[in-house]
Amino acid sequence: MRSAVALCLLLFNYAVHSHEQTPTYPTWKVSGISEIKKTQIRLWNSRPDIEYYEIGVFDGDWQPIPFVTAYKIIPVKYLQEVKVDIYIRESNIEEARYVCSLSKLRSSNESQTLLVTRICSKFK
């Protein structure tokens, strides 16, 4: 029995890498523009095979909410941290529940991962 468990552990010993997103519970703050609120998230890329991440803001039913960032697809190099400012209209604040980052795969002929990761933070 022990040898079977050891064999399974050896065969299925894969390292899974993901990216990180903080804060876990972001809050909206005054942006300096009337009727616009702002929040900031930080992305940390711990995946050597991924270089781009897409940002999205969603309501409780996972429907997209309009928002503005400098870029919707953000380049983040391996082991690099990037801060992203997200702006939204005050009229959409009540609807917005989640801000998510989604890893984007590059289309190339090289061998690549098929694992896409999405990390979401919930607004307080």
Language model features by range: what are they?
Residues 13-15:
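N-terminal signal peptide c-region/cleavage motif recognized by signal peptidases
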Residues 64-93:
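Intrinsically disordered, low-complexity Pro/Gly/Ser/Thr-rich segments with frequent PxxP/GP/PP motifs
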Residues 39-44, 86, 99-103:
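Buried hydrophobic-core signal for structured, non-transmembrane domains
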Residues 1-4:
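Positively charged n-region of N-terminal signal peptides that target proteins for export
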